[in-house]
Design a protein with these regions (language model features):
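ATP-binding N-terminal substructure of ATP-dependent carboxylate-amine bond-forming enzymes
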Residues: 1-124, 128-134, 141, 152-161
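Short secondary-structure boundary micro-motifs
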Residues: 93, 100-101, 167-169, 192
Length: 205
């Protein structure tokens, strides 16, 4: 997802903190898996530095196409080499994933089916919370105060009309994104007219 680097940064921090406290912990890149690990899978939890690299949040979004091309296995699976195998070996999987696939219930459901314990919410809660429109509707139906919102589905041709119809100032966010990626805060209609095209690009729709 566009939050790939945020996930790696979070995972690195968690992994190193656990190792400092005496736990056998490793960082596993969900997409690339253990492609760069050359040891025996049975010994992976003894890997130096827990397979943590120099991961930090970047000021630019990751080039996801470049990431896809970098993986030796060019198959359609979003799970890299030995990811499920090493998860099954662990006592607990700490999910430090952000964004689609990591927070939307899909990886949670996969681990549920495999009987692998993990941290965080289950697949149903994750899926509902990741969709901002669903979350807003649930909060409304439960009488929980939430800021007014508009669920807008549009194409590029709709942008001029939306820029005139939607209230400003406002906050614009893709429906299934997190970590503030893709959030815009236009104060004027001119600024609002520039926002939806970028949101379309980030959301991929």
């Amino acid at each position: 997802s566009t939050e790939r680097q945020v996930s790696l940064t979070s995972g690195t921090g968690v992994c190193r903190a656990l190792r400092q406290r005496g736990h056998q912990a490793i960082l596993v890149d969900m997409f690339l898996g253990l492609e760069s690990y050359t040891g025996r899978l049975a010994d992976v939890f003894d890997a130096p530095d827990g397979l943590c690299g120099d991961n930090r949040v970047l000021s630019t979004e990751p080039d996801l196409e470049a990431v896809r091309r970098s993986r030796r296995d060019q198959g359609p699976s979003l799970l890299g080499k030995d990811v499920l195998a090493v998860c099954a070996m662990a006592d607990l999987v700490f999910l430090a994933l952000h964004g689609s696939c990591g927070e939307d219930g899909r990886i949670q459901a996969t681990l549920d089916l495999l009987g692998v314990p993990y941290t965080g919410s289950g697949y149903l809660g994750s899926g509902m919370a990741m969709d901002k429109s669903v979350t807003k509707r649930i909060m409304d139906s439960a009488g929980i105060p939430t800021a007014p919102w508009h669920d807008v589905r549009y194409t590029r041709e709709d942008i001029p009309r939306l820029a005139q119809e939607l209230p400003v100032p406002c906050a614009v966010k893709i429906i299934n994104g997190g970590s503030s990626i893709g959030v815009e805060l236009p104060d004027t209609r001119e600024e609002l007219a520039q926002v939806p095209a970028g949101a379309l690009s980030t959301a991929g729709t």
